[in-house]
Amino acid sequence: MAVTIDVGDPFDLHPVDKYDVGHRLALAARKLAYGEKIVGMGPLYKKMSVKGNKIILEFTNQGKKLVMGTSPYIPAGKPPHPKPTKLTGFGIAGADRKFVWADAVIEGNKVIVSSSEVAVPLAVRYGFSNSPRCNLYNEKGLPASPFRTDSW
């Protein structure tokens, strides 16, 4: 699997940036098919725990660390993407099952998610919107896969 959520056009099914798609597929093949000891894909959700009004997320395939990143794809004639200052793409919900956009921070190899609108959080979703703006990556520049912690 290769995550391409960050290399496409939100109004087109097929990403214009074929290079990064191919590069990511090749990394996955090198790891999975050929057994190379490399980071072959982006962070994958592993588990969550609740601590007070926060949800703590853990991941596999994170490499040495999780980082905020930007899309490698820059449309012709556009300036480079600015360096992100805030982790985006996370929604959080409580018992009412209503998701709101959340604050998220990277702490070591975990992501801490919270919102002042959700006192007792139960679930997190990442990348759950049309044309989501997601910026969680590993240090190799590979994006995290969208995920959900609920089954609602």
Give the positions of each predicted feature.
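Catalytic cores of secreted or luminal carbohydrate-active enzymes
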Residues: 1-88
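C-terminal beta-sandwich/jelly-roll accessory domains of carbohydrate-active enzymes
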Residues: 63-152
